[in-house]
A protein has these predicted regions:
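Membrane-embedded alpha-helical bundle segments of multi-pass proteins
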Residues: 6, 13, 23, 27-28, ...
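Active-site capping/gating regions of soluble enzymes
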Residues: 37-189
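Glycine-rich anion/phosphate-binding loops
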Residues: 1-14, 48
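Short, contiguous, pocket-lining structural segments
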Residues: 3-6, 19, 41-45
Length: 189
C-alpha cells in the first residue's frame, strides 16, 4: 500500500509540473498482467491504484480535464488458469473506470501491457461498443502495434514494405476498435 501511495504521489507531482509548464501530462498507473491472478484480483488492485492516483492528483491540484489517463485494462494474469474472455475484460474494465475515474477526465489511452495484438484490439473495440462513455477510450500501444511488423521485417531489407503494410493494417484495426467497429474476422482480410 505504501508503494501505491508513493507511486501515485510521484505521478501526481509529475502531472502538476507538466501542467505548470503547459504540457498535457500522460498519467500512467499500470497494474502489470504478469502472474496467475484472476480478473477479480486485477479489478480490486486497479481500483485501489486509481483511487490513490486521483486522490493525489486532487491533492496536487491537477486539472483533471487537462490529463490523459493511460491505465491497464482489467485483465487476468498472463499465466492465469482461466483467462477472462473479451466481453468480460471489456465490462470489468469499463466498470472499474466508471467507479474510479472522474467524468472530467477527457481521454483514456490504454496500454497493451503484454496482451497480444489481437487481444488488445478486441478488448478496446468491445469497450467502445458498450459506449457512450464520459471519456474517450483509445489506444497507446507499443508492442501490440509493433510485434507483427517487426516479425515480418525480421531485419531483412527486402521485407520493409511488407512490414510497413503489417503496421498499417494493425493501425487501421485499432482505429476501428477505437469506434467499436473492429471484428476479429478482419484479421484475415
Amino acid at each position: 500500500k505504501n508503494c501505491i501511495r508513493l507511486n501515485a504521489h510521484a505521478l501526481a507531482r509529475y502531472a502538476a509540473l507538466c501542467q505548470q509548464a503547459q504540457i498535457v501530462p500522460i498519467v500512467e498507473p499500470e497494474v502489470l498482467m504478469d502472474g496467475t491472478h484472476d480478473i477479480d484480483r486485477c479489478f480490486d488492485v486497479t481500483s485501489e491504484v486509481l483511487q490513490e492516483v486521483f486522490a493525489e492528483l486532487n491533492n496536487q491540484q491537477v486539472a483533471l480535464n487537462g490529463i490523459v489517463l493511460k491505465p491497464n485494462m482489467v485483465i487476468s494474469g498472463m499465466d492465469a488458469a482461466n483467462r477472462a474472455d473479451i466481453p468480460t475484460v471489456a465490462s470489468a474494465t469499463v466498470k472499474c473506470l466508471s467507479e474510479n475515474v472522474p467524468d472530467e477526465v477527457p481521454g483514456i489511452a490504454f496500454l497493451s501491457g503484454g496482451q497480444t495484438s489481437e487481444e488488445a484490439t478486441a478488448h478496446l473495440s468491445s469497450m467502445n461498443e458498450m459506449g457512450p462513455h464520459p471519456w474517450q477510450l483509445t489506444f497507446s500501444y507499443g508492442r501490440a502495434l509493433q510485434a507483427e511488423p517487426l516479425k515480418v521485417w525480421s531485419g531483412v531489407d527486402g521485407n520493409i514494405e511488407a512490414a510497413q503494410e503489417a503496421f498499417i493494417k494493425r493501425s487501421r484495426l485499432n482505429s476501428l476498435a477505437r469506434t467499436g467497429n473492429y471484428h476479429p474476422q478482419m484479421e484475415e482480410a
